[in-house]
């Protein structure tokens, strides 16, 4: 336990908070190139084939990104836009791919929550 005099001389340093999305480097989104597109299975209570892409970002990081929505057109060398946001049942997936931006097509026949999937308003 330090004395008051010791605290005046050398005050306590606040703990630094670690960022949840280090690959974005404090930017809202980042561009990247897909190096591998595949499906993976989620953690224990859930069961599915989740679509995932390994992306090399302009910040130099390479990380796993989730492809939201039903169906996608991504393949190796596709240019994608990345946003933050983890997928709770996929370990190591801390980013989402933005649908309807760059090479990623929007989700077809989407009627509700369209802005999340880059879909235009149906006529």
UniProtKB/Swiss-Prot annotation:
Q: Which UniProt keywords apply?
A: Methylation, Ribonucleoprotein, Ribosomal protein, RNA-binding, rRNA-binding, tRNA-binding
Provide the residue span(s) of the region labelled Disordered.
1-28, 104-123
Q: Does the keyword GTP-binding apply?
A: no
**What is one Gene Ontology biological process annotated in the Swiss-Prot or TrEMBL record?**
translation
CDD domains with a match to the protein in the record: Ribosomal_S12
* Gene Ontology CC annotation, any one: small ribosomal subunit
Q: Which sequence positions carry the modification called 3-methylthioaspartic acid? A: 89
Pfam families per record? Ribosom_S12_S23
Bias class Basic residues marks the residues at 108-123
Mind listing the GO molecular function terms for this protein? rRNA binding; structural constituent of ribosome; tRNA binding
The UniProt record lists the keyword Chaperone: no
The record, for PANTHER family, names: 30S RIBOSOMAL PROTEIN S12 FAMILY MEMBER (PTHR11652)
The annotated subunit structure for this chain is: Part of the 30S ribosomal subunit. Contacts proteins S8 and S17. May interact with IF1 in the 30S initiation complex.
Q: What family does the entry list? A: Belongs to the universal ribosomal protein uS12 family.
> What does this gene product do?
With S4 and S5 plays an important role in translational accuracy.
> What is the protein name stated in its UniProt record?
Small ribosomal subunit protein uS12
Q: Which organism is it from?
A: Hyphomonas neptunium (strain ATCC 15444)
């Amino acid at each position: 336990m330090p004395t008051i005099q010791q605290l005046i001389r050398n005050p306590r340093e606040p703990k630094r908070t670690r960022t949840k999305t280090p690959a974005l480097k404090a930017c809202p989104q980042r561009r990247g190139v897909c190096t591998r597109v595949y499906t993976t299975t989620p953690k224990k209570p859930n069961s599915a084939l989740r679509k995932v892409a390994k992306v090399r970002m302009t910040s130099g990081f390479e990380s796993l990104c989730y492809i939201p929505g039903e169906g996608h057109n991504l393949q190796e060398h596709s240019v994608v836009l990345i946003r933050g946001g983890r997928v709770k049942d996929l370990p190591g997936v801390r980013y989402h791919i933005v649908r309807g931006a760059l090479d990623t097509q929007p989700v077809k026949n989407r009627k509700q929550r369209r802005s999340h999937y880059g879909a235009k308003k149906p006529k």
